[in-house]
Each structure stands twice: as structure tokens, then as C-alpha cells.
Amino acid sequence: MDEQAKQLVSEVVRPLPPEPGHPLRIDYEYVREGQCTVWMFVEPLAGWRSVRTSDRRTGVDWAHQVQQLVNDRRYAGAERITLVCDNLNTHQLGSLYQAFEPAEALRLARRIELVHPPKHGSWLNAAEPELSALTRQCLGQRIATRKEVGQLARIWKNCRNRRRVHIDWQFTTDNARIKLRHLYPKMLD
């Protein structure tokens, strides 16, 4: 899972539609309308992702996103759900206890296993390339409201899930030993 902030921006002057020989013309002036957070959960090999939005990006917001994931019928039969998360201070089991009553927090904590990539290893989180694709294909334009961001992200997600676009992770242990050799300890003879 991963999340990113999305700046909300509205137009001051309505863009001029494209005409033959002229692309869409957008005025450089805009109005900041705040920001929202886009949350991405990915199951890479299954070609499934979930995208949601919230107003903020706090530990309590993260806990509510995790609760929705755990309560999803997709994971009803799963004993444990492994979540690869960034090393943010909000991505901790303690956030569940800030957001919920102890019994609910314990129920959620027992269902998830948090895995944090090594420092400077966020590229190991499969949700990052999905967020990048979402931004490039869908959210890289001026969007004024969180509702619009949610609608566009939902359409994108449904299309990707319907096509079962999976992440073909081809980084083997042998490749890691070559490409990441600078991270391995040096043995003296």
C-alpha cells in the first residue's frame, strides 16, 4: 500500500477546446483548492487494486483505510494480510489504537502483518508504480475537488481491475546480488 497527496486546483479561465491545428489551450492561472490524499492498495500478482481518497493523511486516516481493507469481502477468509508500507510514522499498529476501541484495534492488528522496505528501498513497494500510473494516466490534470479525484480514480481502478493488469516483478535474487552488491557487507580475506 502507498499514498500520495493530490493538489486540488480549479481553473480561473475556462480552457479553450481543441480545434484543427490547435491543441487544448489552458490558461496558466489557477486557484488552489487545498489537497486530498489518494490511497492505493495493490495485490500485484492478482491484478487487483483499490483506490480511495481522504481529506488528510494521518495515522487515524491510515487506520480507517486498513479497516476497510480488512473488512473487504475479498479478504474475508484470509487469516493474515501482508501489507508492504513505507516507513512513515503513521504506518504503525499504534495508529489502529488511536483510531478505534481496543477490541477493534486488536482484531485488525491480528489480521495484518506490516512489512517495511529497507531505507531507500521504497521502489520495492508495488503500490508505488501503480500510483505513478494513476497519476500519469488519470490525475495529472487540474482537478478541483476530492469528489472528482475519487470519481476519476474509481474509473481508472475499475478499468485496470477488469483487465487484470498485474505487476510482472522480475527482480530475482541473482539480479539483486548484482544490482545491489553495494548494500552487501564486504568480507575481508
Predicted regions and their residues:
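C-terminal domain-tail junction helix/linker
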Residues: 12, 148-189
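Mobile genetic element proteins and their domesticated derivatives, centered on retroelements
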Residues: 2, 41, 47, 66, ...
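Acidic/histidine-rich, metal-coordinating catalytic segments
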Residues: 78-91, 117-120
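Extended, low-complexity cationic-aromatic segments
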Residues: 1-67, 180
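Active-site proximal helix-loop segment of RNase H-like, two-metal nucleases, encompassing DDE(D)
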Residues: 49, 119, 127-146, 159-163
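RNase H-like polynucleotidyl transferase catalytic core
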Residues: 25-31, 104-126, 142-144
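Short, basic/hydrophobic alpha-helical segments
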Residues: 60-82
